[in-house]
UniProtKB/Swiss-Prot annotation:
The gene is sf3b1. It comes from Xenopus laevis. It comes from the Eukaryota. GO terms for cellular component: catalytic step 2 spliceosome; nuclear speck; nucleus; U12-type spliceosomal complex; U2 snRNP; U2-type prespliceosome; U2-type spliceosomal complex. Residues 204-220, 345-355 have a biased composition (Polar residues). HEAT repeats lie at residues 532-571, 572-606, 607-644, 646-680, 683-721, 766-804, 846-884, 1013-1051, 1055-1093, 1125-1163, 1166-1204. This is Splicing factor 3B subunit 1. Pfam families: PPP2R1A-like_HEAT, SF3b1. The keyword 4Fe-4S does not apply. Residues 169-178, 234-244, 294-307 have a biased composition (Basic and acidic residues). Component of the 17S U2 SnRNP complex of the spliceosome, a large ribonucleoprotein complex that removes introns from transcribed pre-mRNAs. The 17S U2 SnRNP complex (1) directly participates in early spliceosome assembly and (2) mediates recognition of the intron branch site during pre-mRNA splicing by promoting the selection of the pre-mRNA branch-site adenosine, the nucleophile for the first step of splicing. Belongs to the SF3B1 family.
Length: 1307
């Protein structure tokens, strides 16, 4: 409307125009009179339909519709809520479907925390048992037994070494391009000298020694054909502990050095660490035809016919489970292509039970390629396979062909069965089956449904009987327990195996009582079970990749216990045990390392030195560094167990080995580990050990030189401060070495010199320090982190010796030291940080605090917080050691200014800054007075900060500086701080509240009760509700503060308030922390002293009725403390009266209180002994064991307290009540009774006790004699001299004079 209508015509025209526009509008856009608002559609919803938001149609098929459009429309209509900005919401990690809220609380598996180096232990193979040369009186073993001797093991070790070298040569040739593909005999004869005679182990499988046709070598085949898995490798004999040479999951082919399989017991068939016999391959024993066979592979005729004479794996299923743990962890580099022979032995174990599958042991792919898997196979299936198998089983069960009997029952009479047409073949469509069966088992053709199949409706995944829960990871080890069998039908070996399995399952997964019983049983029956069956089951469990710390601890404990019992029977299994236990020696967990040492120590004592040396000798020059490292550590443990002298000849031979540098390296490492492990115990043998390894310092191998220097360093560290004369012979080569070497070698030589210098006399130390310092200063700028650590350590050691002057350090060492080491990156690595701080503190001890602090004080204002922390920690340690005497006024100002800045700028939560601030302020003492207002201003400002951490640090700082404020007479300032802290007692963060209470406690301690502001009468009622707080820090600080007030200022508070506090204190007796319970109990004593014992005692006696034992025990202690504080006569009447209550807990509590009471009051008990005797008579005759136990404890404390006060009559009376309890079997009761008898021996003398004893010492019953001799022995130990006069008289006979007349002399 451009203009306002004024005439009638204009108005009419305008109306028509508006109506026209309205008609043109969409009807939906209009707003009705009673419809929902148009502009507020997003609030109220603009739709009239009552069906809005509902799904209006359902999909015809069973799939869900896409409802996105509907749901989004519905969400658009909802009212907008008030919530945080989207950016903040996106920062919060949303939980996914896979999120496990309990993941962090689950016990971590050992495998999860292992680095790549430690994971090599899972590649180790548990070796077969070896021959015990000492068995049968050292007779020569029967060659038919094929026992593995030391010679066999060394030969296999040699072959493995040669194999690795050849592989390396091939790899180098391939790299350089010299490796050629050779086809045909002519090419091969051209490549090789024709006349050279092959050794027989260089011949391929199908060649005879006589004829040597030139054929492509197996190595060339392996290299030339990528992805080809050779079926029979000549070196497959010993995969050894080689580092990734063999894929543990792959099964090696036939080998040249196969022992004859037919005589091998099943338990032997565990592939070994450098000892794998060829017959371990399942399937190669006769079921497969190898690509190449040679005459060594020929086996007795019966092999194919009788399953029992096959390979060790096929005889008794899973007798030796050595391969299980290895096969199940595939090597990351394993070949992608897998043949069915590559299956792990573990997964085939289930099918090797001849009872359940007819014919020979099946070798096909387990579980999924079998019509009816055996229970063992079922356990090796994945959950998906198991589910598919169950479904198929159900379908087969429903659709199975009906039998004639069932058809007869269904149809009326008169029907007859028609024969099928000639040539009719029923349709078989295995593709439709969920799990197809490609090959019939055991040579049986056609359809075969075992009858057992119908009875076994489903296989339980938990063992029956009283056995603990089986985890999914455990099934492969304990699967036999899932099959219910009649044990009487099993052979003795199988029964034994099942028994061991049950006991191990109880130990691993059972409850503590179940575990205890099983552990005792397996220990007692260890010799009966035998070493082989036990270790064949325990060791694979220990190699399991899913093992947890607690489980490993329990299994190691089992080994420890059975070692004692088995003793020399363990010899053939020493190497097996070492393979599993040696990795514990390099575990990051200290307790695991201790357990490993303990096992190896006991093993050495059981097996003897000769067995240990012959077992571990092949591993000393193993190609794998991991094996050599763990072997060296194990040898050190053997040396500590059997004595260093017994091992010295062997070590001398190993360290001087000319054959391999690896042996020399390991021998010297053994010496180093002995020094680390045994410490100063090496001193008697120091010269011998140094002589053994000194030649290593000039060895041609760099690694040997390095380890020799490190071993010298370890020996010197262990011998400190003695033994410099033993190192005379190595000083010259070390001295030459530090001038010749660079890098790691130099670092090791410097370390050795660094440990030798502190052993020297002052003038020698000074000379050597000056000489070595030139090289050290040169190495200050080395970029190598390891070198830096060693240089810092050596500087610290050199500067710590007496002969080095402060002047020399100031001029020569300090400038380059601070230039190269006090840098930001040194603060980032924790080990460098620690070493730098320690070295700087050592330098300060020589040159004075001011010299060092003046160089680093400005760095307190550095922008890098980690660097500031390092500076602060150094200053704190220097001032803690040397004080602030040589710090001048200017440096003092810089120090306070820098510390305040660093304190305010800190963002991390550790206490370095706090400790540093406290140490510096306390060291400065009165000199800090001018800075106190500034410090307190900072503290008050930070107490008001919004960050809880900042408030906590401010409160902690008050508690650190309160003593200095008192020294500076700043009581007014402290009073002000007290008021401010009182106002902050409403703090909601428990950590901060605990710190505030700690600060109040510190102020109360130094300012005293009467000057305290706020006054105590206002402060204590404010603390009472805080006692309810369940946070340990709050509880501890609060109860300490209340106890201090109760001790020193009880008169400022009304008795009613103290009683209220008493009731709150009862709850604190339940605290987990012992310090809180102890403070609470003491506070009861202070309160009783302040307001009298009666009210407090009434509260405590009521608390004896509670169920919780810890609460009752603490209550009894509190009662005893009240008695001690307020004299026993105030407490005893009420206590003895309480004993009348016919309730077990109360009576036991009273007796316990009496026990503590007489323990605390000591000789004051002489006045009360007659009063409590009737009560003790009743308790000692009670049927309840605990009554008699506690009453015996009372008698013990009472008798020890009243010794020499003439109360023997009463004690003798009580002895008559105690004595009948000597035959109790409960360990707790007998311990209390023996304690009472010990106390009575002291109080009434050994004479009376011996008179009681004599009647039973020669009793006809052994049980009686045992008890009486035990009592007599304890009397004898305690009063040996006093007994002489009281032995019974034995009169002289014709030959002997027994009477000692001098004992009858009287003066």
């Amino acid at each position: 409307m451009a203009k306002v209508a004024k005439t009638h015509e204009d108005i009419e025209a305008q109306i028509r125009e508006i109506q026209g526009k309205k008609a043109a509008l969409d009807e939906e856009e209009g707003v009705g009179l009673d419809s929902t608002g148009y502009f507020d559609q997003e609030i109220y919803g603009g739709s009239d339909s009552r069906f809005t938001g509902y799904v209006t149609s359902i999909a015809a098929n069973e799939q869900e519709d896409d409802d996105d459009d509907v749901s989004s429309a519905t969400f658009e209509q909802k009212k907008p809520g008030y919530h945080a900005p989207v950016a903040l919401l996106n920062d919060i990690p949303q939980s996914t479907e896979q999120y496990d809220p309990f993941a962090e609380h689950r016990p971590q598996k050992i495998a999860n925390r292992e680095d790549e180096y430690k994971q090599q232990r899972r590649k180790m193979i548990i070796s077969p048992e070896r021959l015990d040369p000492f068995a049968d009186g050292g007779k020569t073993p029967d060659p038919k037994l094929n026992a593995r001797t030391f010679k066999d093991v060394m030969q296999e070790q040699y072959l493995t070494k040669e194999e690795r070298e050849i592989r390396q040569q091939i790899a180098e040739k391939a790299k350089s391009g010299d490796l050629k593909v050779v086809n045909g005999s002519s090419a091969s004869s051209a490549a090789q000298p024709p006349s050279k005679r092959k050794r027989r182990w260089d011949q391929t499988g199908d060649q005879t020694p006589g004829s040597t046709p030139k054929k492509l070598s197996s190595w060339d085949q392996a290299e030339v054909t990528p992805g080809h898995t050779p079926s029979s490798l000549r070196w497959d004999e010993t995969p050894g502990r080689a580092k990734g040479n063999e894929t543990p999951g792959a099964t090696p082919g036939s080998k040249i050095w196969d022992p004859t399989p037919s005589h091998t017991p099943a338990g032997v068939a565990t592939p070994g660490r450098g000892d794998t016999p060829g017959h371990v391959t399942p399937g190669h024993s006769g079921a497969t035809s190898s690509a190449r066979k040679n005459r060594w592979d020929e086996t007795p005729k019966t092999e194919r016919d009788t399953p029992g004479h096959g390979s060790g794996w096929a005889e008794t299923p899973r007798t030796d489970r050595g391969g299980d743990s290895i096969g199940e962890t595939p090597t990351p580099g394993a070949s992608k292509r897998k043949s069915r022979w590559d299956e792990t032995p573990a997964s085939q174990m289930g099918g090797s039970t001849p009872v359940l599958t007819p014919g020979k042991t099946p070798i096909g792919t387990p579980a999924m390629n079998m019509a009816t898997p055996t229970p063992g196979h079922i356990m090796s299936m994945t959950p998906e396979q198991l589910q598919a198998w169950r479904w198929e089983r159900e379908i087969d069960e429903r659709n199975r062909p009906l039998s004639d009997e069932e058809l007869d029952a269904m149809f009326p009479e008169g029907y007859k069965v028609l024969p099928p047409p000639a040539g009719y073949v029923p349709i078989r469509t295995p593709a439709r089956k969920l799990t197809a069966t490609p090959t019939p088992l055991g040579g049986l053709t056609g359809f075969h449904m075992p009858t057992e199949d119908r009875s076994m409706k489903s296989v339980s995944d938990q063992p029956s009987g009283n056995l603990p829960f089986l985890k999914p990871d455990d099934i492969q080890y304990f699967d036999k327990l899932l099959v219910d069998v009649d044990e009487s039908t099993l052979s003795p070996e199988e029964q034994k195996e099942r028994k061991i399995m049950k006991l191990l399952l109880k130990i691993k997964n059972g409850t503590p009582p179940m575990r205890k019983a099983a552990l005792r049983q397996i220990t007692d029956k260890a010799r009966e079970f035998g070493a082989g069956p036990l270790f064949n089951q325990i060791l694979p469990l220990l190699m399991s990749p899913t093992l947890e710390d607690q489980e490993r601890h329990l299994l190691v404990k089992v080994i420890d216990r059975i070692l004692y019992k088995l003793d020399d029977l363990v010899r053939p299994y020493v190497h097996k045990i070492l393979v599993v236990i040696e990795p514990l020696l390099i575990d990051e967990d200290y307790y695991a390392r201790v357990e490993g040492r303990e096992i190896i120590s006991n093993l050495a004592k059981a097996a003897g030195l000769a067995t240990m040396i012959s077992t571990m000798r092949p591993d000393i020059d193993n190609m794998d560094e991991y094996v050599r490292n763990t072997t060296a550590r194990a040898f050190a443990v053997v040396a500590s167990a059997l004595g260093i002298p017994s091992l010295l000849p062997f070590l001398k031979a190993v360290c001087k080995s000319k054959k391999s540098w690896q042996a020399r390296h390991t021998g010297i490492k053994i010496v180093q580990q002995i020094a680390i492990l045994m410490g100063c115990a090496i001193l008697p043998h120091l010269r011998s050990l140094v002589e053994i390894i000194e030649h290593g310092l000039v060895d041609e191998q760099q690694k040997v030189r390095t380890i020799s220097a490190l071993a010298i360093a370890a020996l010197a560290e262990a011998a400190t401060p003695y033994g410099i004369e033993s190192f005379d012979s190595v000083l010259k080569p070390l001295w030459k070495g530090i001038r010749q070497h660079r890098g790691k070698g130099l670092a090791a030589f410097l370390k050795a010199i660094g440990y030798l210098i502190p052993l020297m006399d002052a003038e020698y130390a000074n000379y050597y320090t000056r000489e070595v310092m030139l090289i050290l200063i040169r190495e200050f700028q080395s970029p190598d982190e390891e070198m830096k650590k060693i240089v810092l350590k050596v500087v610290k050691q050199c500067c710590g010796t007496d002969g080095v002057e402060a002047n020399y350090i100031k001029t020569e060492i300090l400038p380059p030291f601070f230039k190269h080491f006090w840098q930001h990156r040194m603060a980032l690595d924790r080990r460098n940080y620690r070493q730098l701080v320690d070295t700087t503190v050592e330098l300060a001890n020589k040159v004075g605090a001011a010299e060092i602090i003046s160089r680093i004080v400005d760095d307190l204002k550095d922008e890098a917080e980690q660097y500031r922390k390092m500076v602060m920690e150094t200053i704190e340690k220097i001032m803690g050691n040397l004080g602030a005497a040589d710090i001048d006024h200017k440096l003092e100002e810089q120090l306070i200014d820098g510390i305040l800045y660093a304190f305010q700028e800190q963002t991390t939560e550790d206490s370095v800054m706090l400790n540093g601030f406290g140490t510096v302020v306390n060291a400065l003492g009165k000199r800090v007075k001018p800075y106190l207002p500034q410090i307190c201003g900072t503290v008050l400002w930070r107490l008001n900060n919004k960050s809880a951490k900042v408030r906590q640090q401010a409160a902690d700082l008050i508690s650190r500086t309160a003593v200095v404020m008192k020294t500076c007479q700043e009581e007014k300032l402290m009073g002000h701080l007290g008021v401010v802290l009182y106002e902050y007692l409403g703090e909601e963060y428990p950590e901060v509240l605990g710190s505030i209470l700690g600060a109040l406690k510190a102020i109360v301690n130094v300012i005293g009760m009467h000057k305290m502001t706020p006054p105590i009468k206002d402060l204590l009622p404010r603390l009472t509700p805080i006692l309810k707080n369940r946070h340990e820090k709050v509880q501890e600080n609060c109860i300490d503060l209340v106890g201090r007030i109760a001790d020193r200022g009880a008169e400022y508070v009304s008795a009613r308030e103290w009683m209220r506090i008493c009731f709150e204190l009862l709850e604190l007796l339940k605290a987990h922390k012992k310090a809180i319970r102890r403070a609470t109990v003491n506070t009861f004593g202070y309160i009783a002293k302040a307001i009298g014992p009666h009210d407090v005692l009434a509260t405590l006696l009521n608390n004896l009725k509670v169920q919780e034992r810890q609460n009752r025990v603490c209550t009894t202690v509190a009662i005893a403390i009240v008695a001690e504080t307020c004299s026993p006569f105030t407490v005893l009447p009420a206590l003895m009266n309480e004993y009348r209550v016919p309730e077990l807990n109360v009576q036991n509590g009273v007796l316990k209180s009496l026990s503590f009471l007489f323990e605390y009051i000591g000789e004051m008990g002489k006045d009360y002994i007659y009063a409590v005797t009737p009560l003790l008579e009743d308790a000692l005759m009670d049927r309840d064991l605990v009554h008699r136990q506690t009453a015996s404890a009372v008698v013990q404390h009472m008798s020890l307290g009243v010794y020499g006060f003439g109360c023997e009559d009463s004690l003798n009376h009580l002895l008559n009540y105690v004595w009948p309890n000597v035959f109790e079997t409960s360990p707790h009761v007998i311990q209390a009774v023996m304690g009472a008898l010990e106390g009575l021996r002291v109080a009434i003398g050994p004479c009376r006790m011996v008179q009681y004893c004599l009647q039973g010492l020669f009793h006809p019953a052994r049980k009686v004699r045992d008890v009486y001799w035990k009592i007599y022995n304890s009397i004898y130990i305690g009063s040996q001299d006093a007994l002489i006069a009281h032995y019974p008289r034995i009169y002289n006979d014709e030959k002997n004079t027994y009477i000692r007349y001098e004992l009858d002399y009287t003066l």
